[in-house]
Design a protein with these regions (language model features):
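Bacterial carbohydrate/catabolite-sensing allosteric modules
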Residues: 1-155
Length: 155
């Protein structure tokens, strides 16, 4: 997965070694909460980078059960900028925004361009928050994702 490869590359670029014991690969409530609890018990981490904003909720929950304050005692970053999680968790979740609208718009334009075998006039594209790659980019194409800084990371 691209996110996992990016996580490993960011660790390496920052001079940290990848440690598989710090990675939890869980899909649902019970196992996720137990995995986060185990990390707190065994490693006492000061921060979490979560696969998505929904997974970040588990870290908030475990931190609260331990009397820890998110953004002060522990930092949490999610991925998606999913409004239900990123804006309703307290403090609000710092997150890497996936530009879903832009990704869908680009994919639809790319598909139309391929079906019609002609380029799409990109001058008529909507103004978006994330720059879109050219339609002649190879698939898979990379789209810029912005870090949306909120209150869940210690300053």
């Amino acid at each position: 997965d691209g996110r996992f490869a990016g996580y490993q590359a960011a660790l390496q670029d920052s001079g940290f070694a990848y440690d598989p014991s710090l990675v939890c690969n869980v899909l649902n409530n019970g196992p996720a909460l137990r995995a986060v609890d185990k990390l707190f018990d065994e490693r006492n981490p000061d921060g979490f980078f979560c696969f998505n904003d929904a997974r970040a909720w588990y870290v908030y929950e475990c931190a609260a059960r331990r009397g820890l304050t998110v953004g002060k005692d522990v930092s949490i970053v999610g991925v998606d900028n999913h409004r239900v999680f990123a804006e309703t968790l307290e403090p609000q979740l710092t997150t890497v925004e996936l530009p879903h609208y832009e990704m869908g718009y680009w994919a639809a334009c790319k598909l139309i361009s391929m079906i019609e075998r002609k380029p799409v006039d990109s001058s008529s594209w909507p103004n978006t928050t994330a720059p879109m790659p050219p339609l002649d980019s190879p698939i898979p194409a990379k789209i810029h994702c912005a870090l949306i800084e909120k209150g869940s990371v210690r300053s």
